[in-house]
């Protein structure tokens, strides 16, 4: 359930409200023995309701069905799939293939990674801060599996005199001389997935379509599992050269595409391991889609498929790696924002924080600067006045165990877990603990556990939450010259159309205008920190 939903609160009551819109029966676990003596039927009803909710959640989310799909692909029992890690999926297929090919299988072992053992990761083409228009996103289909197949990368083909030379220096035998186990397995999985997807298109039965869709998704998960385990430091077949070779080929691919596009005057505003974001020279839907399809066909070669995944209009980033937000307008128009890397996606952010950030992004994409400022100021004012429900301020974090940290007495999740146990609730190491900060001025800060369905009778530290909101919002609005102090004062008058800020969009003059340094365009206003008292 944690893998599927990543909910901010993991109690049965909280997940039931999130998924089913229903809650547990109101029985205090601390007085369960008394309830059993006085009202046995109610306790029985309570237990039946708990079991019913848990089963319905599993069926609604599809956890069991997804486990069965992965079990089918990996040839494992469902129980093993649901409780094991990804290396078990890879092991099941790879050990079978090794046994049938007469290849020895190492005993599993664990080794602590050393700093100099870490392989270089994928390439990231940093995005400069700004608002971009008509952004084409091209994404490699199954990039790592395709690279492994194309270059015959495997522990069985790694040799000093191989014909295939990785950018990292490792050499592999050509498939004509020796076909690797890993490329053979991945080729079979890729063909299996293509066959399933063809059957999906052919069927008119919704139930069969749903089943096949789950199956092809499971094949994709298993395919991508192999790079992960070979790039790790614990897998039985791990060799540093293999993981390094895969990422080296990936970096070469992506940087080559970026160089080609930019030499032709097509600005690439962002790129990562397997995708590139290009500013379209056409400023309309039809023209941008045509350009995107052309580039997709052009760079799909040598067994690699570069798909035209989506078109965004507009897209915003404040310049941090892997953090952006945009509106998808193709292949289908989406009402929801696509958000990557910001607090909206983090399970330890509180709901009001996520909600305000989502609304703030919407106004930024609409170039509504006055609305953005008003939103932040009004939200902070409401928090300081205590006009927000406690459940909007809940912070959650996983707790490994009560003695799993060096300074447990300073950890908010430990403090909340202990108080939760005092209230009669069970604690299981690894579970997510939820709390509300009641006094941030102390060291450590004081927190109280929040239990879904149980009234919260303490007073939150509203000043603490207001400060967090201003700090979070300022990281976004500083792109436009609005600092944390400006947000608290509400006095900054910059707009998206002032000379201090030029949205990074393609113009008729040509791409060279887009490429001007953002540092020359954005002047961040410096000011002293302003207290919340001064704000009011």
What residue spans do the PLM features occupy?
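Catalytic palm subdomain of template-directed nucleic-acid polymerases
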Residues: 276-293
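C-terminal, non-catalytic extensions of nucleic-acid polymerases
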Residues: 289-536
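Catalytic nucleotidyl-transfer cores of nucleotide-processing enzymes
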Residues: 7, 111-230, 322-335, 339, ...
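Generic non-transmembrane alpha-helical segments
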Residues: 19, 253-264, 290-302
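Catalytic palm active-site di-aspartate
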Residues: 193, 265-279
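Hydrophobic, well-ordered secondary-structure elements that form the walls
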Residues: 193, 223, 254, 274, ...
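Active-site-proximal helix-loop-helix substrate-binding element of RNase H-like nuclease domains
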Residues: 1-51
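Common nucleic-acid-contacting/processivity interface regions adjacent to the catalytic cores
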Residues: 33-142, 146-149, 208-252, 256-260, ...
């Amino acid at each position: 359930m944690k893998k599927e939903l990543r909910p901010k609160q993991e109690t049965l009551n909280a997940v039931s409200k999130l998924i089913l819109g229903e809650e547990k029966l109101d029985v205090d676990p601390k007085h369960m023995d008394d309830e059993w003596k006085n009202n046995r039927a109610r306790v029985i009803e309570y237990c039946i309701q708990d079991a019913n909710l848990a089963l319905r959640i599993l069926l609604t989310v599809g956890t069991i069905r997804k486990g069965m799909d992965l079990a089918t692909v990996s040839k494992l029992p469902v129980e093993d799939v649901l409780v094991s890690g990804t290396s078990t999926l890879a092991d099941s297929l790879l050990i079978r293939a090794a046994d049938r090919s007469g290849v020895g299988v190492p005993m599993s072992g664990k080794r602590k990674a050393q700093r100099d053992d870490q392989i270089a990761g994928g390439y990231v083409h940093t995005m400069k801060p700004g608002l971009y228009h008509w952004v084409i996103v091209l994404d490699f289909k199954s990039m790592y599996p395709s690279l492994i197949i194309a270059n015959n990368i495997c522990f069985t083909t790694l040799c000093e005199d191989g014909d295939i030379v990785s950018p990292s220096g490792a050499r592999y035998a050509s498939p004509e001389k020796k076909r690797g186990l890993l490329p053979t397995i991945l080729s079979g999985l890729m063909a299996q997935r293509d066959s399933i997807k063809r059957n999906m298109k052919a069927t008119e039965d919704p139930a069969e379509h749903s089943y096949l869709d789950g199956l092809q998704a499971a094949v994709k998960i298993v395919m991508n599992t192999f790079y992960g385990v070979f790039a790790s430091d614990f897998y039985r077949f791990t060799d540093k050269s293999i993981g390094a070779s895969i990422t080296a080929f990936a970096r070469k691919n992506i940087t080559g595409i970026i160089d080609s596009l930019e030499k032709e005057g097509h600005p690439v505003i962002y790129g990562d391991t397997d995708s590139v974001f290009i500013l379209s020279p056409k400023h309309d839907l039809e023209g941008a889609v045509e350009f995107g399809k052309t580039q997709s066909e052009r760079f799909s070669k040598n067994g690699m498929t570069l798909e035209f995944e989506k078109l965004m209009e507009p897209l915003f980033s404040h310049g941090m790696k892997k953090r952006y937000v945009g509106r998808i307008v193709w292949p289908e128009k989406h009402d929801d924002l696509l958000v990557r890397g910001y607090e909206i996606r983090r399970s330890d952010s509180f709901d009001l924080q996520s909600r305000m950030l989502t609304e703030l992004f919407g106004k930024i994409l609409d170039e509504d600067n006055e609305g953005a400022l008003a939103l932040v100021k009004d939200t902070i004012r409401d928090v300081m006045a205590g006009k927000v429900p406690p459940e909007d301020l809940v912070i959650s974090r996983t707790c490994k165990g009560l003695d799993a940290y060096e300074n447990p007495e300073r950890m908010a999740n430990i403090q909340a877990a202990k108080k939760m146990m005092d209230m009669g609730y069970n604690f299981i190491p690894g579970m997510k603990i939820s709390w509300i900060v009641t006094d941030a001025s102390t060291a450590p800060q004081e927190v109280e556990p929040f239990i879904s369905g149980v009234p919260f009778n303490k007073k939150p530290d509203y000043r603490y939450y207001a400060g967090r909101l201003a700090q979070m919002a300022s990281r976004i609005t500083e792109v436009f010259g609005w600092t944390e102090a400006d947000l608290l004062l509400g006095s900054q008058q910059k707009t998206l159309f002032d000379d201090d800020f030029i949205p990074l969009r393609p113009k008729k003059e040509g791409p060279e205008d887009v490429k001007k340094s953002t540092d020359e365009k954005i002047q961040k206003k410096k000011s002293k920190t302003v207290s919340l008292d001064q704000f009011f």
